[in-house]
């Protein structure tokens, strides 16, 4: 299978490079800049990402692997693409002067294509002016020996693309992986062609390869899984079940903090052991208001209950988790060709004393790929396209102390909010929507009487990966705006007229950053 190694020097856009390449049916992995070259020497090509560093900072550890890749290119002619800081590293290595700017350039700007190159073939014509996104503090003043300037900035004549066709080394000062760059994905596609990558990274191939890996490692032994009903958990369970069948034992723990009437809707043939521990969780949360303390109590209690249920199954050697690639990258564990199955090391908070090996069938898939895989397996759209739900459940959406009554109120609000949203055909246009119950009461009037009830906040955001988010529908000046305002008026009326104890509804307009998506 063809594969590209992406060396991450800290760019906020690195995952976008990987997503674009994956969408072109080519496998790629992201590695930290301190990775040993031996780990990545078998890849078909290398991309050096952008980053906040400067070649003048003397970051020997960061530049070390880049230098080894360039030396490897000299011996093998393996293709290299340097983006932003990656360009500066490459050009600096070959002796070009890299100028340290006093002011960072972060904007959409125009470049002019000056010469033909295989990296811009059928993407941009010579003499054409192209919109690109620049995000850099340093710039390359002169092309290194053996390199040709392919494009430069229209306004400031910054070297935008350089290429050494003989060595198959290409560099861009701009970011081809982001949307402001016109046809940037086609430039990346050209690089894949230069690297002779086969377009064979498909959902069918992923399923078959992962099934084979799981079978080979698990053998005839038992696997246990704590299932939540979320997208990642459900897809991981379905894929693992297809590999080992009834060797997989699924446990669903009702914490009392789930959505109203929440159940696990997996493939019909997958058995699930339901355990109701709602009274235990709620009793341990009594009097607790700090969100971190709530999370800790829920996590520890969950581990305790899961251990008890695992002992009932007995003789399990493997624990399955729905870890996905963004979890791995963001936690700093994207290093080396880690196997899909590895020794348990307290991922997810489960204690080492359980002595289980970890099965992570989705470890190298992004969220959008997980959804596609779930569809290929046969899971329903209701499972695949559901909104994210926090691990601690409604405990972090009931602000302040959590008790059975407040959870009940929030469950009622949540059900009305989500169902009404679906009736307005808005649910699939929103990345995440939920309600929050606030620990304050306000005065209201219903009929001829005074009320003193809770305030609930509604939140709906659009996002690509949850790293940033905008309040719906303000990032999208479309017909959805008018529909959404009508929806908000209607759903707030339904809530206050049907949920006892609530007399006021507010809407959260804050983007991320500065706020987080969840309130706690």
From Swiss-Prot:
One of its GO terms (molecular function) is ATP binding. Gene3D superfamilies: 3.30.300.10, 3.40.50.880, HUPs. One of its GO terms (cellular component) is cytosol. Pfam families: GATase, GMP_synt_C. The active site is at 84 (nucleophile), 175, 177. Coiled coil: none annotated. Residues 201-386 form the GMPS ATP-PPase domain. It catalyses: XMP + L-glutamine + ATP + H2O = GMP + L-glutamate + AMP + diphosphate + 2 H(+). Its EC number is 6.3.5.2. It comes from the Bacteria. Homodimer. Catalyzes the synthesis of GMP from XMP. This is GMP synthase [glutamine-hydrolyzing]. It comes from Wolbachia sp. subsp. Brugia malayi (strain TRS). The lineage of its organism: Bacteria, Pseudomonadati, Pseudomonadota, Alphaproteobacteria, Rickettsiales.
């Amino acid at each position: 299978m063809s594969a590209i190694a992406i060396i991450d020097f800290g760019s906020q856009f690195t995952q976008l490079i990987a997503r674009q390449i994956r969408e072109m049916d080519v496998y790629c992995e992201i590695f930290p800049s301190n990775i040993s070259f031996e780990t990545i020497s078998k890849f078909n090509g290398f991309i050096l990402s952008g980053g906040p560093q400067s070649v003048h900072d003397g970051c020997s550890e960061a530049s070390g692997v880049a230098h080894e890749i360039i030396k490897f290119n000299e011996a093998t002619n393996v293709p290299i693409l340097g983006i932003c800081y990656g360009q500066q590293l490459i050009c600096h290595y070959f002796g070009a002067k890299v100028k340290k700017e006093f002011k960072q350039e972060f904007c959409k700007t125009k470049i002019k294509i000056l010469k033909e190159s295989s990296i811009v073939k059928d993407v941009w014509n010579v003499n054409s002016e192209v919109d690109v996104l620049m995000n850099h503090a340093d710039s390359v003043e002169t092309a290194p020996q053996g390199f040709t300037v392919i494009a430069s900035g229209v306004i400031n004549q910054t070297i935008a693309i350089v290429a050494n066709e003989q060595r198959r080394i290409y560099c861009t000062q701009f970011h081809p992986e982001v949307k402001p760059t016109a046809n940037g994905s086609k430039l990346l596609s050209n690089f894949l062609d230069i690297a002779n990558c086969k377009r064979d990274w498909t959902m069918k191939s992923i399923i078959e390869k992962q099934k084979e890996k799981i079978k080979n490692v698990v053998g005839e032994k038992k696997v246990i899984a704590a299932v939540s009903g979320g997208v990642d958990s459900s897809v991981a369970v379905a894929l693992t079940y297809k590999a080992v069948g009834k060797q997989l034992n699924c446990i669903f723990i009702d914490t009392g903090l789930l959505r109203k009437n929440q159940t696990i809707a997996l493939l019909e043939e997958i058995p699930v052991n339901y355990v109701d521990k709602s009274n235990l969780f709620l009793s341990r949360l009594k009097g607790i208001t700090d969100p971190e303390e709530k999370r800790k109590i829920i996590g520890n209690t969950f581990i305790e209950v899961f251990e008890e249920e695992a002992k009932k199954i007995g003789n399990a050697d493997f624990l399955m988790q729905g870890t996905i690639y963004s979890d791995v990258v963001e936690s700093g564990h994207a290093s080396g060709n880690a196997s899909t199955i590895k020794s348990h090391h307290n991922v997810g908070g489960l204690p080492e004393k359980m002595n289980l090996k970890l099965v992570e069938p989705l470890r190298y898939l992004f969220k959008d790929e997980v959804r596609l895989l779930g569809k290929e397996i046969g899971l329903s759209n209701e499972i695949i396209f559901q909104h994210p739900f926090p691990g601690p459940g409604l405990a972090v959406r009931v602000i302040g102390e959590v008790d059975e009554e407040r959870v009940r109120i929030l469950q009622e609000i949540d059900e009305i909010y989500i169902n009404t949203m679906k009736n307005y055909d808005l649910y699939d246009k929103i990345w995440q929507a939920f309600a929050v119950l606030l620990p304050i009461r306000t005065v209201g009037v219903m009929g001829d009487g005074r009320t003193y009830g809770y305030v609930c906040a509604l939140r709906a955001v659009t996002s690509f990966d949850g790293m940033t988010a905008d309040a719906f529908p303000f990032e999208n000046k479309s017909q959805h705006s008018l529909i959404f305002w009508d929806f908000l008026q209607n759903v707030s009326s339904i809530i206050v007229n049907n949920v006892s104890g609530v007399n006021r509804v507010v809407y959260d307009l804050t983007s991320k950053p500065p706020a987080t998506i969840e309130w706690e």
